């Protein structure tokens, strides 16, 4: 961990940290290392799941993000994913979890199904982004959007996650009708307005 932290600190950029935007909780410590650089450094490390879990528990932005790349995706499943879910406290962590870890897991569909029921906005967001990136979508996941929107009617990240998941599902002809019917049954709210606007042009092509 010390070596990895040293590499991150060499790339420290206070201006980037100050300008950084994400939804959710702030980090305990943020060196302001750009996300592409965090990924580049993390990918020089071999998979070490125990180390990744340790890094993810640290209150340092760059170590948390790197942990998603160092973890072994074959070792995460619905029954042991709580450590990761509990540590996802903002939109940046949710997006990187989906991109770097969840979508590569053989158990991604089971994890997505579990996380969509979470009481954490960010865990739900991560699940939807993982579903979109890995095509881990079934009718159940699509229809869950109705409940999710009712729980988070004013959340822009949740609305964006819904669009990502619905748009990915709509590419499959088998799911097009259920996507349309799901959108039609959403309660009127800010999240629904965003979803309908974004999906309207996507469903035209």
Regions found by a protein language model. Give the residues of each.
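Alpha-helical scaffold domains
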Residues: 1-205
């Amino acid at each position: 961990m010390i070596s990895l932290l040293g590499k991150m600190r060499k790339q420290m950029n206070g201006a980037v940290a100050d300008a950084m935007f994400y939804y959710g909780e702030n980090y305990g410590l943020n060196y302001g290392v750009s996300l592409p650089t965090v990924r580049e450094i993390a990918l020089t490390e071999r998979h070490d799941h125990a180390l990744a879990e340790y890094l993810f528990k640290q209150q340092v932005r760059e170590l948390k993000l790197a942990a998603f790349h160092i973890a072994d995706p074959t070792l995460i499943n619905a029954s042991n994913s709580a450590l990761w879910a509990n540590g996802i406290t903002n939109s940046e962590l949710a997006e990187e979890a989906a991109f770097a870890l969840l979508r590569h897991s053989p158990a991604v569909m089971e994890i997505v199904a579990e996380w969509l029921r979470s009481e954490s906005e960010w865990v739900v967001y991560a699940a939807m982004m993982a579903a979109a990136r890995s095509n881990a979508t079934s009718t159940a996941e699509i229809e869950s959007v109705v409940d999710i929107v009712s729980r988070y009617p004013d959340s822009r990240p949740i609305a964006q996650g819904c669009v990502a998941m619905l748009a990915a599902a709509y590419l499959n002809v088998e799911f097009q009708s259920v996507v349309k019917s799901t959108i039609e049954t959403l309660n009127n709210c800010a999240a629904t307005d965003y979803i309908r606007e974004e999906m309207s042009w996507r469903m035209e092509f």
